[in-house]
Swiss-Prot record:
One of its GO terms (cellular component) is extracellular region. It is found in: Secreted. Expressed by the skin glands. GO terms for biological process: defense response to bacterium. Has antibacterial activity. Keywords: Amphibian defense peptide, Antibiotic, Antimicrobial, Disulfide bond, Secreted. Pfam families: Antimicrobial_2 (PF08023). It comes from Rana latastei. This is Ranatuerin-2LT. Disulfide bonds join C23-C28.
Length: 28
């Protein structure tokens, strides 16, 4: 359903934001 799509998009955004944060902290 639509909620599943939104949840998936939110998860992807969260994951990429987490990756960027990790890069800032650990320098990738």
């Amino acid at each position: 359903g639509l909620m599943d799509v939104l949840k998936g998009a939110a998860k992807n955004l969260f994951a990429s934001a987490l990756d960027k944060l990790k890069c800032k902290v650990t320098g990738c």
